[in-house]
C-alpha cells in the first residue's frame, strides 16, 4: 500500500474523465470532420490520452514517478501469459454462451435488438480496420492495465485493503464491458497476476493477446448479416456448450485464484518509485523530511514520512523493529511474528 495514493482520488479521475468527454466531443461535433475521423480522434483522446495524462499529472504532483508503472523487474512469464489468456477466454466464451441462452429464451426481442445494433468491425475501410486493431490490441491494454491495475488497485488498497481492492476494481472493470461476468473474472486474474509478477507488462501482454483473439473472431463474423429471427436465435443458443466451456475454464481459474488469494495480503501491491529518490543523491538539510511527534495518554508516536512507509511497504496492523545504531534510528518491517 503506497500512501502517495491517499491523495490521488477516484472521484477526481471520474470527474476529469467526464470533463474530458465534453472537451473532446463538443469541438468535434462543431467541426466538419468525417465520422470515421471523429471516431479515431475521440477514441484516442477519451480512452487513451486523457486518462494517462491525468494520471501522469497526479503522480508527478504526489512524488510518484509515472514511468515506474512500466518498470520491468524480470523476464515476462510467457507460459503463464499464454495459459492465462487461453483459459480466461474459454471461461468468457462459456459464460457468454450461457448468457446468450438465457436472454434468447427470456428476453428474445431485447437480444435481437442488441445483436442488430452490436459493434461489428467494418472491413470496407482499410484505415479504420488498422485503427481498430491498434486500438484494441495496443492502446486499450496499455490504458486499462495502467489505470485499473496500476492506479485503481493502488488507491483502493490504501483505502480498503488489498483484497477488497481486487474485488472492487474488478467489478468496476466488469461493468465497463458487455460481458460483465467474464470481464470481472478477467479483472480478478489480472489483479492477482500484477501482484504476483509486479510487472505491468505481463498484464499488458495477456490483455493484448486476449483482445487480438477477440478482435480476430469479430473479423470472422464481421460480414453484414440478414435480419435475425427469434426462433433462429433460440436454435443457435446452446446451454450445454456454455456450461462445458465454463467448467473447463474454471478448472484452471479456481486453483490459480485460490492459490494467489491466500498470499495476496503478504505480497501486497507492486512498489512504485519516487521522484525525490531519483533526484536526491546525498542527505542534506534542504531535503530532510520532518516528522511530527504525537503524545497521548499511553504513548509517544512519531509520524513516518510517506517515503519510509512506501519503502517498507507498511500496512495497517504491521509490526516493525526499532533499533538505535550510533546516532541513527533503524526501522525494519517484521515479516514473521
Model-derived segments and spans:
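C-terminal membrane module of polytopic membrane proteins
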Residues: 208-281
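Short beta-strand-centered segments at strand-helix junctions
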Residues: 299-313
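Membrane-interface helix/loop boundary segments of multi-pass membrane proteins
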Residues: 143-168, 192-199
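Juxtamembrane helix-loop-helix connectors linking adjacent transmembrane helices
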Residues: 32-38, 67-140, 158, 268-271
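Hydrophobic residues within alpha-helical transmembrane segments
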Residues: 139, 168-172, 205, 209
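Long, compositionally biased stretches
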Residues: 271-296, 316-337
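Alpha-helical transmembrane segments in multi-pass membrane proteins
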Residues: 12-63
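Membrane-helix interface linkers and caps
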Residues: 1-5, 41-86, 106, 254-269
Amino acid at each position: 500500500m503506497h500512501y502517495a495514493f491517499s491523495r490521488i482520488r477516484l472521484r477526481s479521475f471520474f470527474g476529469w474523465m467526464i470533463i474530458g468527454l465534453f472537451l473532446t466531443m463538443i469541438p468535434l461535433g462543431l467541426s466538419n470532420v468525417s465520422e470515421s475521423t471523429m471516431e479515431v480522434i475521440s477514441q484516442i483522446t477519451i480512452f487513451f490520452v486523457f486518462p494517462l495524462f491525468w494520471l501522469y499529472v497526479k503522480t508527478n504532483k504526489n512524488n510518484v514517478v509515472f514511468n515506474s508503472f512500466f518498470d520491468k523487474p524480470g523476464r515476462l512469464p510467457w507460459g503463464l501469459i499464454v495459459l492465462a489468456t487461453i483459459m480466461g477466454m474459454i471461461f468468457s466464451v462459456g459464460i457468454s454462451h450461457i448468457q446468450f441462452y438465457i436472454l434468447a429464451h427470456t428476453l428474445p426481442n431485447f437480444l435481437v435488438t442488441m445483436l442488430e445494433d452490436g459493434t461489428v468491425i467494418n472491413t470496407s475501410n482499410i484505415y479504420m480496420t488498422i485503427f481498430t486493431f491498434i486500438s484494441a490490441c495496443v492502446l486499450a491494454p496499455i490504458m486499462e492495465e495502467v489505470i485499473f491495475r496500476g492506479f485503481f488497485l493502488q488507491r483502493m488498497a490504501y483505502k480498503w485493503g488489498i483484497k477488497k481492492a481486487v474485488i472492487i476494481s474488478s467489478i468496476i472493470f466488469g461493468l465497463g464491458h458487455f460481458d460483465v461476468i467474464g470481464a470481472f473474472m478477467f479483472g480478478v486474474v489480472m489483479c492477482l497476476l500484477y501482484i504476483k509478477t509486479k510487472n505491468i507488462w505481463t498484464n499488458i501482454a495477456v490483455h493484448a493477446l486476449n483482445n487480438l483473439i477477440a478482435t480476430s473472431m469479430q473479423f470472422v463474423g464481421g460480414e453484414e448479416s440478414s435480419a435475425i429471427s427469434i426462433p433462429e436465435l433460440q436454435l443457435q443458443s446452446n446451454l450445454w456448450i456454455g456450461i462445458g466451456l465454463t467448467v473447463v475454464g474454471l478448472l484452471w481459474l479456481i486453483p490459480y485464484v485460490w492459490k494467489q488469494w491466500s498470499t495476496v495480503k503478504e505480497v501486497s501491491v507492486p512498489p512504485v518509485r519516487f521522484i525525490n529518490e531519483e533526484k536526491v543523491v546525498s542527505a542534506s538539510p534542504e531535503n530532510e523530511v520532518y516528522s511530527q511527534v504525537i503524545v497521548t495518554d499511553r504513548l509517544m508516536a512519531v509520524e513516518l514520512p510517506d517515503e519510509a512507509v512506501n519503502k517498507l511497504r507498511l500496512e495497517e496492523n504491521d509490526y516493525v523493529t526499532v533499533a538505535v545504531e550510533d546516532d541513527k534510528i533503524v526501522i525494519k518491517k517484521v515479516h514473521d511474528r
